[in-house]
């Protein structure tokens, strides 16, 4: 029994979450660049899922899907890093609510150690974009 994930199912769940996030960010009116960043994240995930190799063994299949999920979360955290209006907090709240839905076969369930869920699997790589943004900001402040 191999792992079968529908790309439409993944996008439906993510689209609902992103719509809620974008609505909350739009209400603040100050983080317009977030829209482009999050849509780029969604498109990149879509490209990866569309070009996903279907003939992998089950373990490799799951690792591949989870790496796409990790990349998506790193991308969203990076897109939200410049927005100081609480969008990152809303994103974290959405992730927690999504996990609580307990949808069988969700990426939170399938990838429990990924950047999208608590765990140790990719803790450092998920933190790396935030570190880079922090260091870039610090560097700019030092130069001024």
From Swiss-Prot:
A lipid is attached at residue 114 (GPI-anchor amidated serine). GO terms for cellular component: plasma membrane; side of membrane. Expressed in sensory regions of the brain including the visual, auditory and olfactory systems. Within the retina, only expressed in the retinal ganglion cells. Concentrated in axon tracts including retinal axons. It is a lipid-anchor; GPI-anchor. Residues 1-27 form the signal peptide. One of its GO terms (biological process) is neuron projection extension. Modulates postsynaptic dendritic arbor elaboration and synaptic maturation. This is Neuritin-A. It comes from Xenopus laevis (African clawed frog).
């Amino acid at each position: 029994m191999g792992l079968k994930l529908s790309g439409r199912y993944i996008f439906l769940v993510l689209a609902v979450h992103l719509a809620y996030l974008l609505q909350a960010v739009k209400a603040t009116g100050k983080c317009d660049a977030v829209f482009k960043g999050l849509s780029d994240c969604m498109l990149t995930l879509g490209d990866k899922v569309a070009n996903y190799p279907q003939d992998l063994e089950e373990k490799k299949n799951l690792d591949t899907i989870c790496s796409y999920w990790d990349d998506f979360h790193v991308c969203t955290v990076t897109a939200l890093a410049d927005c100081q209006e609480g969008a990152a907090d809303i994103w974290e709240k959405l992730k927690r609510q999504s996990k609580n839905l307990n949808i069988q076969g969700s990426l939170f369930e399938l990838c429990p150690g990924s950047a999208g869920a608590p765990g140790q699997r990719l803790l450092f790589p998920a933190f790396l974009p935030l570190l880079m943004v922090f260091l870039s900001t610090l560097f700019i402040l030092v130069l001024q």
